[in-house]
C-alpha cells in the first residue's frame, strides 16, 4: 500500500500512540526513510488503566525496527483537570513533540490521521457550526516550530486494519474510542465508508466556498486595520453575516487576541456581529475575560480592562505635583496648573464622574463631547484637569481619530 509522495531525504519525528493508525504509519515509513533519520515520540497519559500496554507495544516495535524512541510519561490527578481533556492532552502532546524537535533539530512531524479522521472532523465541524480555517484536515499544517504532515489522509481505517491483521502486527485498542459520551465517537459509530466519496465532494465544495469568503475577508482587513483597530466601513455592513463573523474572527487572530475567543468563539462572535448589525449606538463594550471589545463610532478595538480603570488625583498645591507619574501627560498638565494657579485641581480619567459636573467652552462636558464626536477612547483614556471650584476643564481635548 503506497503512502503519499513523502520526501525520503528528510528527517522526521513520528507520533506513535500504539494504536492501529500510528503503528501502520510507522511500519510503512521505515520502508521509505532511513531508520537513522526517524525519531518515534510516544506520550503515555496514564489516563486509562491499560495505557502502559500501549507504551509497551511502541517500545517493542521500536526495538524490533531499531528506532530511536522518546517517551513522555504524565502522572496527573485527572479529577482536578478543569479543562477539556482532549484539548489539554493535545497541547501536552504537541509541546512535547516541539521539545523533541529542538533536541534533535528535526522539525518535520508525521501524524497518523486517516481518511476516517478527516471525515469525522468535517462532520464534527458541521455539528458545532464553528468558524474554521479549513474543513476536514489539512495534509500539512504548523504548530510552533513544527511542520506537521498527515500522509494517511487518503487511506481508510478498514484498509489500515486489514493491513495490520493480515501481517499479524500488534496494535493497541483505545477503549475510550467507543465511549459515545464523546461527540466524535458518536459520529464514528455511524460512519459508513461507502459514503466517503460523496462526503469528500461536499468537503471540497465547502473549502472552495471558504476560500472565496477568505479572499473577501483578507481584502477588507488589509485595508481596514490600523494600529490594531478595525475600521467599520459602509462596505462591511453590505456583506452577509458569515463574512462579517469571519472578519471579526480573523481580526482577533491578526492582533494576537484569538485566545480571548477560545471555548466561546461561536457565541461571542455571533453576539459581536449581532450588536454591530442591529445597534445604532456609537459606543458599546463587550467583556472578554481581562479585556474588552469596544465599538467607538466607526472603530472596533480590544483593550485591557486594567487600562479602563479610572484614575483620579487631587492637586491642592505645587508639592502635590512633585514626582507625579500617574498620568503620561503630567508635564503638559503641570504647565496648565502653573499658568492658572487657582488651587485646588482634579486630574482624572473618570469620564462617568466628570462628564456631568464639568464644562468646556460654556457647555456641559458631556454635550461638548457629543457635539464634536469625541471618541470614547479619548474620553476613557485621556486625563482632564479642572478646578474644583468652577469645574471648568482647562486642557484641550484631543481626538484619538
Swiss-Prot record:
Subcellular localization is given as: Cytoplasm
Q: What is this protein called?
A: tRNA(Ile)-lysidine synthase
Q: EC number(s) in its UniProt entry?
A: 6.3.4.19
Q: Which InterPro entries match?
A: Rossmann-like_a/b/a_fold (IPR014729), TilS/TtcA_N (IPR011063), tRNA_Ile_lys_synt (IPR012094), tRNA_Ile_lys_synt_N (IPR012795)
**Domain of life, source organism:** Bacteria
Q: Which family does it belong to?
A: Belongs to the tRNA(Ile)-lysidine synthase family.
Q: Which GO terms describe its cellular component?
A: cytoplasm
Organism, by scientific name, is Mycoplasma mycoides subsp. mycoides SC (strain CCUG 32753 / NCTC 10114 / PG1)
Q: What keywords appear on the UniProt entry?
A: ATP-binding, Cytoplasm, Ligase, Nucleotide-binding, tRNA processing
* GO BP terms: tRNA modification
